[in-house]
Amino acid sequence: MKQYLDLMKHILAEGVDKSDRTGTGTRSVFGYQMRFDLSKGFPLVSTKKCHMRSIIHELLWFLKGETNVAYLRENKVSIWDEWADENGDLGPVYGAQWRSWPTQSGDAIDQISQVIAQIKSQPDSRRLIVSAWNVGELDKMALAPCHAFFQFYVADGKLSCQLYQRSCDVFLGLPFNIASYALLTMMVAQQCDLALGDFVWTGGDTHLYSNHMEQTALQLSREPMPLPTMTILRRPESIFDYQFDDFELTNYAPHPHIKAPVAV
């Protein structure tokens, strides 16, 4: 994906060197946007191999409302292990906020069910929003939400989605985030009988870690391949009934995987 490589080049050319919570150090820019037309292919980075199985299982885990890594470990997905406690718990991270945002009255709001109902009944609403940034629970989370807020938009029978990501690890995290929200948009569009529009990614502190520079240079030396195709093989009764085998990725011919350390 040329947009992704252009972002890397922009950070290297225009970014500033900053310290960070992990102590690793970053080169960072503030405020960047990319747009992907989902009708023209699935936006999965091809200049290194991305682990689509982990992306799918993580998204299904979010949609289940789970915050313990047991499901992920059962499916050989380890991307959250560094932040889990000895019992596998992460606190009220994404799944909890998406599916059971606590209210002052002691109830819980299922934001995913709510936004899908709103898309169906009020497609022109400007409130088609899901937020994971619950200020009152941030101190209980193993990791504050990086992809914090997303909004749907319906026009001409097409569903688009914009994500605001307050903090973005461009080398390791961003390929996952783009693919995950593109897939979520496909699922919601199917549930709402809408065609695919755009996925718009907006980044806040958008950075390359200082120990990812060699890997970034290698990736920039590679030529992007044509976008693959993601097919949803069946239509479940609800957004919560999708299973891993419902998704088929074809024509994905990436360059080899590039290993890099995770900043914890």
Swiss-Prot record:
Keywords: Cytoplasm, Methyltransferase, Nucleotide biosynthesis, Transferase. GO terms for cellular component: cytosol. One of its GO terms (molecular function) is thymidylate synthase activity. DUMP binds at R21, R126, R127, R166, S167, C168, D169, N177, H207, L208, Y209. The active site is at C146 (nucleophile). Pfam families: Thymidylat_synt. The keyword Nucleotide-binding does not apply. It catalyses: dUMP + (6R)-5,10-methylene-5,6,7,8-tetrahydrofolate = 7,8-dihydrofolate + dTMP. One of its GO terms (biological process) is dTTP biosynthetic process. The keyword Translocase does not apply. (6R)-5,10-methylene-5,6,7,8-tetrahydrofolate binds at H51, D169, A263. Pathway: Pyrimidine metabolism; dTTP biosynthesis. It comes from the Bacteria. Its EC number is 2.1.1.45. PROSITE patterns: THYMIDYLATE_SYNTHASE. InterPro entries: Thymidate_synth/dCMP_Mease, Thymidate_synth/dCMP_Mease_dom, Thymidate_synth/dCMP_Mease_sf, Thymidylate_synthase, Thymidylate_synthase_AS. Homodimer. Catalyzes the reductive methylation of 2'-deoxyuridine-5'-monophosphate (dUMP) to 2'-deoxythymidine-5'-monophosphate (dTMP) while utilizing 5,10-methylenetetrahydrofolate (mTHF) as the methyl donor and reductant in the reaction, yielding dihydrofolate (DHF) as a by-product. This enzymatic reaction provides an intracellular de novo source of dTMP, an essential precursor for DNA biosynthesis. This is Thymidylate synthase.
